[in-house]
Amino acid sequence: MKIVLAAINAKYIHANLAIYSLRAFSDEYKEQIQIKEYTINQYTELLHQLRPEMPVWFGGPEVSYDAAECLQRNHGVTGILRGEGEESFHELMQYYIGGSGKLQDIRGIIYREDGLLVDNGWREVMDLNKVPFVYEEMEDFKNKIIYYETSRGCPFSCSYCLSSV
């Protein structure tokens, strides 16, 4: 099985730190993980029609905020990783690629099962020291703007913004 990590609305010159963190955190599955940066949300329904057996997962603050509503609007999406996704993503890799574990045991996800939404709750905030350095192979970032995180989210929790989620 191949895993594609796709950044929504990523520009050519911007590297999406989140998807590189997911790949780095699940290093033992690196050969199965491909990174694509383009607008995927418009293609999920088409992907579902062409390959209904292929799981499609979303993640990030935009979908974490109201994950159930997002799943109801996007029938081609299997589930959503909510909040910080590295540990949940790693467990999804163990489930799909390694053949171990159960979806109902993975904290931080909401997904479809037999037409119903199953909400496993939010995962605890992780220790950022566990996330490996993502820029080991700098040739992947030639002519791109790269990002460094010194903290997660925004501390201000403005009512109109999802960056603090």
Where are these regions (language model features)?
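Radical SAM [4Fe-4S] cluster-binding motif and immediate context
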Residues: 129-165
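Gly/serine-rich nucleotide phosphate-binding loop at the start of the catalytic core
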Residues: 31
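Glycine- and acidic-residue-enriched helix-capping/strand-helix junction motifs
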Residues: 10-19
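Secondary-structure boundary/capping motif
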Residues: 14-15, 66, 130, 135
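Residue-level recognition of beta-strand->loop/alpha-helix junctions
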Residues: 7-9, 37-39, 165
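A cross-family glycoside hydrolase active-site/sugar-binding cleft signature
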Residues: 6, 57-59, 149
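Glycine-rich beta-alpha loop elements in corrinoid/cobalamin-binding modules
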Residues: 2, 18, 22-26, 34-124
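Nucleotide-activated donor-dependent transferases that construct or modify glycoconjugates
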Residues: 1-11
